[in-house]
Amino acid sequence: MCGIIGYIGTRPATPILIGGLKRLEYRGYDSAGLALLDAQGLTTFKAVGKVARLVEKLRGDLAPEKHESYTVGIAHTRWATHGAPTEINAHPHFDKSRKICVVHNGIIENYRAIREKLQSEGHKFDSDTDTEALSRLIGVHYHGDLRLAVVKALQQVEGAYGIAVLCADEPNKIVVARKGSPLVIGMGDGECLVASDASALVAHTQRVIYLDDGDIGVITPDSVDIRNQDDEPISRDVSELGLDIGAVEKGGFEHFMLKEIFEQPESVRNALRGRINTTEGNALLAGMNISPTELAQIQRIVLVGCGTSLHAGMVGEYAFEDVSGISAEVQQAAEFRYRNPLVDHHDLVIAISQSGETADTLAAIRKAKEKGTMILGLVNVVGSAIARETGRGVFIHAGPEISVASTKAFTGQVAVLLLMALKLGRGRRLSQEHGLD
């Protein structure tokens, strides 16, 4: 439950980074930090507790006139996994020369082996984190090309990561990379941003690029260069966020959960709008894209998800059996991915996720693909990893859900699952006698 925001452009970076961190507070965290870069090099600030504590440190330690000189920076909210919630363990973390710094979401699984090797070579670690093993490893590989150093370091890393990297010797760029932890690049006029969640970008741009696993990008004020792990240039689509700033603000409510409870009627309307053919009593879900041949071969539906999405699937299970006349079951994605699930081309797997980035659900999709199974996605976020991985499915159009406790996303998921059950049922020529009306 960490957050990343980065900025490079011509505007003062500090307020943009702090504003981004505040948009990411909903993810939960125990400390925060940022790194700013100018001609004099890197400057970092860290604080335990709320982002407000970090703001206090900035006000106390950074002269007001200095704010204008920093037009490049990266920032992070941390939820402790390796090491206690202390300032030393807060991000960003440096390499040995203290010219390279990194913010990181995810877990470096082989960090102990990397740490021990580097210690044997004379490195003295400042923190207890897995991230510092990565930042120092990047420094070891740095010989004037930050992107190449990141590529080489990541080739030695096992685990999940979403990272943003700064180097004092290359102040005109931020290097970013993703594997198993979401990152999205935002593009403005003469500026670029990167964040772990699009909600941190909505105040600055509507034009975004969602990175895929294995992508390594270099962003400058005027360009985005994305390559794969073999250093080959690749193209990623530019998407429109389609969000306004009001969607990620409380709007007069005491907290986001209360706001989102009251948004449920509208979110259900959005989920159903334009998707019901009242004349024929059918659902219009072109995104499912299931041919009559594929529909005829479905013998079982397997709904996979985690948390709230898993519970939405439990409701959907009854609907598919009752309305579609197809055997259905619900499985925890975190367990499905580690088993040898008995699924094949006669099964339909429906992967449910609000964010479209749930790591266990993504892994479950890939496991199902290995078995030759048909897969549909049911997600809220357009352009998310699950939407791209499945290639077909349905969006719930609930808008951003900031509260950790899901409300409108759950009701939207249930509404769309009922539509999907209706669509499959009508496709199998079930009628009134079978309980559809």
Where are these regions (language model features)?
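Conserved short alpha-helical segments that host acidic/polar catalytic motifs at enzyme active sites
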Residues: M1-H255, E263, R269-V302, Y338
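Internal active-site segments that recognize and position negatively charged phosphoryl groups
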Residues: H255, K259, S309
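Glycine-rich phosphate-binding loops that contact phosphosugars or nucleotide phosphates
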Residues: A296-L436
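Hydrophobic face of alpha-helices
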Residues: T131, S135, R147-V150, L258, ...
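Acidic-histidine catalytic/liganding microenvironments
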Residues: Q264-P265, V323
